[in-house]
Design a protein with these regions (language model features):
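Long, contiguous all-alpha helical interaction modules
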Residues: 1-5, 11-12, 174-462
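Basic, glycine-/proline-tolerant helical and adjacent loop/strand elements
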Residues: 2-173, 178-182
Length: 462
């Protein structure tokens, strides 16, 4: 029953203060918003909590009518001498007449699942707890069922207190009109700390002072989330993080290649970063990285393309070391190729052929960049790299280079020995048929974006 005395006391206070409440508390009555007023049950210095039962009673008046989805989805189950109430909880599933597909019509009770009042209340408290985390930007929830703890992090958090979860759950939540659980998955042996340190390297020897924005992240990265930040910023120009769960039609990215890549690969990237699922990530990275590098270059973002190749080759070294495959690292390969081609280009002796296919395709990238540099066009579009990057037949590739030579030879000095050496070694070398397309494209891009050996000043011996 309602305590009439307390009810009238509250009613009287409302009538007396409602139109001057802004004088009691800081509030803007001009706003079109709801105003909630709460009355304390306990007195200021009350020690024996006389009204404790009243507090619980009023709390229950509000909670229990709202704990279930609808009254029509509540049933009473008789157990011996008493009845238990079960219903479809308000949180977790929203069932109404517009969603008849949620009904399970093959059984007597069509309601998808039922909870008793205690469990429904517990679920309500859990969802409210999750909502408070979502409101504060803590979107990544890790539930450790072995150590009985919950950890919540934003995408930017360093996670210094987070080590591993041997068994548990992962939730990705978002605040919408209600709490949205965007992803739920079981987690087994998840570690944010990488098994091996990830070394983000600079293969182009970029000048740190001239390009601080592009070199600031060079170095060791210990955690998946740290590497995930590199993926988001370098590969996806910061568009991935905000579009993991956006409907494809709602992704506001004008670049069609970037948008398509986000839609195709965001799930496997998300799983690797936040769930520790390694399956397919290496293969996916190998595919999308090359597409994004080419796309950046075609759109005249050369520095971005260089950092993307840096990150891709850093991943290549990481996975090679992780699988203990051995062999040379990409930094060694890049340096050897650069120095070998430079030595051949600057030589005044007889022309020497490239040692292997990697050197050959690097040289192709170098000569393509040189031809484009000779263009008299006011705006030199990097899309000209398409003339050589998308050719699979070597004979056609050489014919295309000869066409470029005929187009720009008016600007080439007859005594340009470096050009002659570079062009001669390309025309005189026949690559192996088994060279894979990925390696070919990577080396052409590397040669194209690297400092050009025709223009590089010759080092003089002391």
């Amino acid at each position: 029953p309602v305590n009439i005395e307390i009810l009238e006391k509250c009613r009287s206070w409302i009538k007396q203060h409602i139109f001057s409440i802004d004088k009691l508390v800081q509030i803007d009555l001009g706003k079109k918003d709801y105003l909630k007023i709460f009355f304390e049950v306990f007195e200021v210095n009350e020690e024996d909590n006389k009204n404790r039962e009243l507090f619980i009673q009023e709390d229950n008046r509000y909670i229990y009518p709202n704990i279930y989805n609808k009254s029509e989805y509540i049933i009473n189950v008789k157990k011996k001498v008493y009845e238990d109430t079960y219903g479809l909880p308000y949180y977790g599933i929203n069932m109404n007449r517009k969603k008849p597909f949620l009904k399970i019509k093959t059984r007597k009770t069509f309601i998808p699942y039922l909870l008793d009042m205690d469990k429904a209340l517990l679920q309500k408290q859990f969802f409210e707890y999750l909502m408070s985390l979502a409101v504060n930007g803590k979107n990544n929830i890790y539930i450790d069922i072995k150590n009985y703890r919950i950890r919540a992090y934003s995408d930017q958090d360093e996670r210094k207190d987070f080590s591993e979860i041997s068994s548990g759950y992962y939730l990705r939540i978002q605040k919408g009109k209600e709490l949205e659980i965007q992803v739920q998955d079981n987690i087994v042996d998840y570690q944010n700390k990488l098994l091996l340190n990830f070394y983000y390297q600079d293969f182009f020897k970029m000048n740190v002072e001239n390009y601080p924005e592009y070199t600031k992240d060079i170095g060791i990265h210990l955690k998946r989330t740290s590497v995930g930040r590199l993926i988001n910023e370098i590969f996806f120009s910061k568009y991935l993080l905000t579009n993991y769960f956006t409907d494809a039609s709602d992704i506001s990215v004008k670049d069609s290649v970037l948008k398509r890549t986000i839609v195709m690969y965001r799930n496997v990237i998300f799983d690797w970063i936040y769930k520790g699922i390694d399956n397919n990530f290496e293969l996916a990275e190998r595919r999308f990285s090359l597409d994004l590098i080419k796309n950046a270059l075609i759109n005249n973002y050369t520095l971005r393309a260089m950092t993307q190749l840096n990150l891709h080759w850093s991943f290549k070294d990481y996975f090679t070391e992780l699988k203990q495959q051995g062999g040379e690292k990409m930094a060694e390969i890049a340096t050897e190729i650069r120095e070998s081609i430079k030595e051949r280009v600057t030589s005044k002796e007889e022309v020497k052929m490239p040692i292997n296919d990697k050197e050959y395709y690097y040289a192709v990238g170098q000569i393509a960049a040189y031809f484009i540099s000779l263009s008299k066009a006011g705006k030199k579009s990097q899309s000209m790299i398409n003339l050589v990057i998308n050719i699979s037949d070597d004979r056609v590739l050489k014919e295309r280079l000869i066409q470029l030579y005929k187009k720009y030879n008016y600007a080439i000095d007859h005594y340009n020995v470096r050009f002659k050496n570079l062009f001669a070694m390309i025309l005189g070398y026949k690559p192996a048929a088994q060279t894979d397309r990925q390696t070919k494209d990577e080396m052409i891009l590397f040669g194209y974006m690297d400092s050009n050996s025709i223009y590089t000043k010759k080092e003089e011996n002391n």
